[in-house]
Amino acid sequence: MTETTKTAKGISRRSLLKTASAAAGRAAGSGVVTGFPTIWAQNPITLRQFGTGVSNLNAIAEKCKADLGITLEMTATDSDAAAQRAVTQPKSYDIADIEYWILKKVYPTGVIQPMDVKKLKYYDKVVPLFKNGKLKPDSVIAQGTAPHTVGYFESADAKTFAKQPTDWMTMVPTIYNADTLGIRPDLVGRDITTWADIMDPAFKGKTSILNIPSIGIMDAAMIMEAMGNIKYADKGNMTKEEIDKTIDFLIKAKQDGQFRAFWKSFDESVNLMASGEVVIQSMWSPAVTAVRSKGIACKFQPLKEGYRSWGGGLGLSSGLKGVALD
């Protein structure tokens, strides 16, 4: 497992994304949990947090220290390493800053404890997406592990997810966004309108998708369905036959040389696009911004099939107790 401790960079990268609860923001440093500032001042507390580089930013730790007097030690990993650490090293952290799709892997192991919503001051400000799966009343609920499907437990000691909101939340939601294809409009030479465009022979050897298996296979599913190769009942809960077809598709596309590379980190995606080695790839919106900041044309391209969405939040270690838990 590869980890890197964050150095001071200020707010950047995917911190440009939407906050999941309007005033809630981060659980620490924003008043989400309240009523204990005097205790904290008398008993200095250090909390260990790990998660992806998306949101483990030194500026957040600095704000937490300034507002609450709590020292927040942050360690950044990639998504796969975050899931592995959450399960296999539960004594190494107090706060797990992870994505919702990881919860199905993590919660059954008992390493994260349910969170009493009555202790969350701004719980009523959490956007509906994390409570019922809809941004607006007429929104269509997404396929896959939508945050609300793993957002609650029936009780404080339950090991299964609740179908409706309860008093016990799995995590405080913090950020969410929807990803699509990033393109070099100066190099693609035509309009890009569908996920299927990434398989255009004209782009052979100049495309890329994400090399995090649980997310990259969703890229492949969006592409395959857009091409008319398959119609998934639920892309986030594939049958064995659907998985086999999707993997076979990826293997053939790679063997045919369609992909220049598979990227795993923010910087990799930026470098591939900025260098011109890749002209169309699955991409995060702040990575597009990073390419533009270099004076290079890059576009976060809307597609007719829609976006691949995601969300993340803060979970509490089952080992947290007493003042540290508060």
Identify the residue ranges that each predicted region occupies.
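N-terminal secretory signal peptides
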Residues: 1-15, 38
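N-terminal export leaders
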Residues: 12-32
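Early extracytoplasmic/lumenal segment of secretory-pathway proteins
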Residues: 42-109, 270
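Extracytoplasmic ligand-binding site segments that recognize negatively charged/polar headgroups
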Residues: 55, 107, 112-268
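Short beta-strand-to-loop elements that line the ligand-binding cleft
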Residues: 72-78, 97, 257-265, 301
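Hydrophobic residues within well-ordered alpha-helices
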Residues: 86-87, 271-276, 316
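Paired acidic/hydrophobic, glycine-rich loop segments that form the ligand-binding mouth/hinge
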Residues: 93-98, 262, 279-284
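Extracytoplasmic/periplasmic substrate-recognition and gating elements
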Residues: 283, 287, 292-326
